[in-house]
């Protein structure tokens, strides 16, 4: 999900593939699978708390969709993803404790709030790769309906 704080910064998780450390690290949006009985909104709230340490957010609409295939930690993934917009009603410095799964403990290195300018200026590797460009319209309230397939 795209979790934005009151300053318009996006929460990203720094990760690497523990099966391929030579591939380097990247910054990604928090998220994960939808568990049985969950809606995509409930899954986003759970993942935001687990990965980001954010207890409260206002869930918004699905803004992007994507189909991805990748290998991670020795597993092959082929999945359809929905990406919600979430508004975190506090400044970005207020991150609580994470509740990570075992593979996340091995893969996640850091978490922080990024401005679009920081992402554009620093050549920061992100997933999705065009994240900084995609965020521009979202920050100005230009959220497409139906969602954009990225």
Summary of predicted features, one role per range:
Residues 1-28, 41, 56:
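N-terminal strand-loop-strand
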Residues 12, 61-64:
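A structural microfeature
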Residues 17-19, 64-68:
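Short active-site-proximal "capping" loops at secondary-structure junctions
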Residues 34-58, 66-124:
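Unchanged
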Residues 123-150:
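Charged phosphate-binding loop/patch that engages nucleotide di/tri-phosphates or the phosphate backbone
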